[in-house]
Regions:
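Short, conserved catalytic or interaction motifs in soluble domains
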Residues: 87
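Short, hydrophobic/aromatic-rich beta-strand segments within well-structured domains
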Residues: 65-84
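Basic, Lys/Arg-enriched alpha-helical interface segments
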Residues: 1-62, 75-76, 90-111
């Protein structure tokens, strides 16, 4: 499996997880390797899934921790990590973020 991080995902990972960024990324990757379809599909986003992971900086488990959105392209064995958010800051995507993700998915599926 190949993991591909968007610039936005990587930036937020560093901001939110600080020196624990590698641990958070490993936890996400381990979860997705075990089950690439683990997250729930977000309606209207072309197959993007939303899942949870813990937040070691704030001492939160999966329920109160971080949310991430990803696209699993099964044929290519690629997982695109797209967005990472702190649940306390923002639990779901804005209209603008959803529109941007729809465009990203269209491009990724074309390649």
């Amino acid at each position: 499996m190949v993991f591909i991080e968007s610039t936005a995902f990587t930036r937020r990972l560093r901001e939110l997880a600080d020196e624990n960024a590698e641990d958070v990324l490993n936890a996400i990757q381990d979860d997705l390797l075990a089950n690439p379809q683990r997250g729930s599909i977000v309606q209207g986003l072309g197959g993007i899934r939303k899942a949870r992971t813990g937040d070691p900086v704030r001492g939160k488990g999966k329920r109160g921790g971080l949310r991430y959105w990803y696209l699993y392209l099964e044929r290519r064995h690629h997982i695109h990590l797209l967005i990472l958010l702190n649940k306390d800051e923002q639990e779901d995507l804005s209209y603008r973020e959803r529109a941007t993700l729809r465009q990203m998915v269209a491009e990724l599926k074309r390649i």
